[in-house]
Amino acid sequence: MTSVDTPTPHGGTPAPAPATANGRKLLRIEARNAQTPIERKPKWIRTRATMGPEYSELKGLVKREGLHTVCEEAGCPNIFECWEDREATFLIGGEQCTRRCDFCQIDTGKPAALDRDEPRRVAESVQAMGLRYSTITGVARDDLEDGGAWLYAETVRAIKRLNPATGVELLIPDFNADPDQLAEVFSARPEVLAHNLETVPRIFKRIRPAFRYERSLSVLTAAREAGLVTKSNLILGMGETPEEVTEAMRDLHEAGCDILTITQYLRPSPRHHPVDRWVKPEEFVEHSRVAEEIGFAGVMAGPLVRSSYRAGRLYAQAMAHHGREIPPAMAHLAEEGTASQEASAVLARFGS
């Protein structure tokens, strides 16, 4: 195995307000954000890359076959650990989102036409990579009559047809809580249905203006009522207080959320929301303790945890929590693996 330290980029100097990737003029909020320099990151925002044999094999295969994963294209710091365990994430629906969130690096604009062949290609990529667990996420497609519900559902169905032993987690937008669109998505029966709340009520409208706090909770409730394992994520460091985080966790649990991930906000560019503060590892440990006390079936919290991090393990924990058996073909997901970005592990490496 080869190990190297991979620090995330440091900032600290003002940058000129850039145009967006698709050339559109900056929004007023983006221009205001850009007046704040990119923040210097603390010592614990660092990951240790361990390039084991599974990772090296996948890396070579992805390059040879021209496959595309969010893991590589977004430069995720957890790629070494996830790929070593044969887990990966794919983005569907194109490169343009019809909504804008102030933390998200995906550009807002008019999306390309629906690519109805995309589910097949994603399923074949999952097969080629020999994945044990796959996460599918995507952009909001309010331009489509069904909001993209068919695309999300068909991608799950295509993966399952070609890869019956691979777990599938589906991270969805809210589809405006439309019952028919949600029913289409739920009918594909992913192992986990995720919808990320991301932040607390007080700052929700500012951070996610096209979403609604209560509507997001209702999506999770509907998924739980459909018999699915549910999951959500909270991003810290955007202006919330610890007390508000606890209340949001309670709201999520009451809405029927089984699995919770909690992470630190990392600013993608100067035009995105400035980092309000760097949440220390010990605070993540405390949030994790409170979440478990509230009753979540699976919790993963840490500065560099992402919503798809160790997703297979969290699914297995949720199934065990509810006394449900994991399908025999997916029994491998219950095996213990590393979780180097979990808060207690980060605290052990870097201290407070």
Swiss-Prot record:
It comes from Nocardia farcinica (strain IFM 10152). This is Lipoyl synthase. Residues 83-297 form the Radical SAM core domain. Its main location: cytoplasm. CDD domains: Radical_SAM. InterPro entries: Aldolase_TIM, Elp3/MiaA/NifB-like_rSAM, LIAS_N, Lipoyl_synth, rSAM. Pathway: Protein modification; protein lipoylation via endogenous pathway; protein N(6)-(lipoyl)lysine from octanoyl-[acyl-carrier-protein]: step 2/2. The gene is lipA. It is found in: Cytoplasm.
